[in-house]
Amino acid sequence: GKAFERSAPCGPVLPVSSLGDPFEGNLSLTVNGETRQTGNLNQMIWKVPEMISYLSEYFELAAGDIIQSGTPSGVGAVEKGDIMIMTVDGVGSLQVNVV
């Protein structure tokens, strides 16, 4: 399952002005150094403004809220001891050690 204590790690909050184009940027996920997922933000079915517009019809969104969306193809299981590194060009990387 995806929903358990400390199961949604995220990196530092950055001002939008420091990120460049929010609709363009390569992203990748490696597991133990092996590339598992690659994609680009321009491949998202729903763009960020569309997601915000839709969700705000049902939920009150506030500064600091996080909206999680889908992921590129290549989803697979991970195991205890695996090291996952997610990178988004122009934003940075986040490393997660599976425990």
Residue ranges of predicted features:
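Catalytic-pocket segment enriched in acidic/His residues
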Residues: G1-V99
